[in-house]
Amino acid sequence: MGWNALGAVGKMSFGYIANAIGAAGGQHFTRKDLNYAYKLAGSSVAKNLTFNLVESETATKIRSMMDNMDILKDYSYELYTNSVRGVTATKLKFLSPFNLSQRAEYLNQAPIMIALFRNTKYTTPNGKTTNLYDGFTKEGTWNTAEFGEAPTALINKTRIKLDKLIMQ
């Protein structure tokens, strides 16, 4: 499984198909939301291909949200990351055997998060209607200055729905 480029391509392909089928049903998010989400997730690809030299605010926001809400579900990440420390875990991370698999999972799951959070509407205390994705800062925290207190119950409900979608 480690360093398996074809496995990562297969994982991304099947993930894309599964995400597209989910969007076609329109139950949780639309095809338009998913297309936009893949466009945004593309900024993460540029960051990874340049070894973090090219970093956009969008890529930072997506990664921060994924990390802060513990969204990325990948068995190799869960098993491997906690046991490896030091230089290999940080500076030489791109050489890890499961790197390609983890990146494929990220590119499958990040668009689902973005699409679902964009499709979940929220009305601020001021009466402004927005979506949950736009309510987060690039640090992956709720923007209280612009949108008021975080709708914690709605965010948690959406996270649970997201976890179920990812695990399908």
Regions found by a protein language model. Name each.
Residues M1-Q168:
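Hydrophobic, often aromatic-rich secondary-structure segments at membrane interfaces
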